[in-house]
Amino acid sequence: KAYEIWSIKPPLQRARIIFKFKEVIEKNFEELAKLIVSEHGKVFEDAKGSLTRGLEVVEFACGIPQMLKGDFTENVGTNIDSWSIRQPLGVCAGITPFNFPAMVPMWMFPMAIACGNTFILKPSEKDPSCPLRLAELFKEAGLPDGVFNVVNGDKEVVDAILENKDIPAVSFVGSTPIAKYIYENGAKNEKRVQALGGAKNHCVVMPDCDLDQAVNGLMGAAYGSAGERCMAQSVAVAVGNIGDELVHQISKKLETLKVGPGMDKTSEMGPLVTKEHLEKVRGYVDLGVKEGAKLVVDGRDIKLQGYENGYYIGGCLFDQVTKDMRIYKEEIFGPVLSVVRVKDFDEAVKLINDHEFGNGTSVYTRDGDVGRTFASKIKIG
């Protein structure tokens, strides 16, 4: 019933409600950020940054309803004209991960709703409070009941979404195994499926680079949000003779990286999301040692006074990692950076292209030709 009403609402009226939603989010911005910190654990500045990224999509969605125009072609055949119109799909669904409980949902539902669809959001069971609050704020902005719905649960709820014939489209962000599961079962039930899986993202560090810039970039890319993001650069590829100095500079930075509770203004990295995830990340560090990688910085046993039972781990740094090791092949999803050494640029490109997956990559160099060649040869994204 909600779809029947919302799908025929004039575009300008939809746009006004979404614009009001944007204003309501801005009014409650700090409250939402604190919800993320309290439930997920990321530091306050990271929480605010992720909210801002999501809000940008809401702002963009405000203009979408009036851009949905059809086409007309005259006389495509004898006395035949052709019209095409753009119609909503219906009830769409989104399944989102724990690491960005506001930003990733806001990539999905504002755009779908702007186009006249209704939406079911299944957030992570680890931190659902912010999505639930967003639903309340959307209603406060004037969205009719039933247009945006949040359902909590685990695999049982996911399967119900995938099997429901009244849901024609599903979006997913999360791990690669579950992305494959979503694709397989969604396609089996004739749904449109959009799924973003996990990754192992590389950063190539060339001998001619500005090393300070590379190290500062890697500190944010590898350890920001405690490494709990699909775009985290968890592999640094050291080309030529740059490896020793790169490892030395990163290890020095890690010595002063402040780990602590998210609302502490001095904290640069917060805890991991759950005890189970902490044990998983620690297990990967244990595995790296067994596999023969050199653990240069070990953050496994970090202790914070007053937070002894918190899910904290310090930044970890491995050197002499090889492509046959599991810590290189698999997504750790924690503050762990692996340094792989290669002899030249071509070997670096081959290493990245041979990896099973990757959402993004980068190169630090002063040579414009190297940057251009890198962009054209890399098969990532």
Where are these regions (language model features)?
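Rossmann-like NAD(P) dinucleotide-binding subdomain of oxidoreductase/dehydrogenase enzymes
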Residues: 70-213, 342, 365
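ALDH superfamily catalytic-core signature
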Residues: 177-322, 344, 351, 378
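A structural signal for short, well-ordered beta-strand elements
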Residues: 7-8, 40, 150, 207, ...
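Residue-level signal for inorganic ion chemistry
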Residues: 14, 36, 58, 116, ...
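N-terminal alpha-helical segment of soluble enzymes
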Residues: 1-44, 241
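Residues at or immediately preceding the N-termini of alpha-helices
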Residues: 11, 29, 44, 211, ...
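Long amphipathic alpha-helix in the N-terminal Rossmann-like dinucleotide-binding domain
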Residues: 19-30, 42-68
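Conserved C-terminal structural/oligomerization subdomain of aldehyde/semialdehyde dehydrogenase
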Residues: 167, 204, 258, 308-381
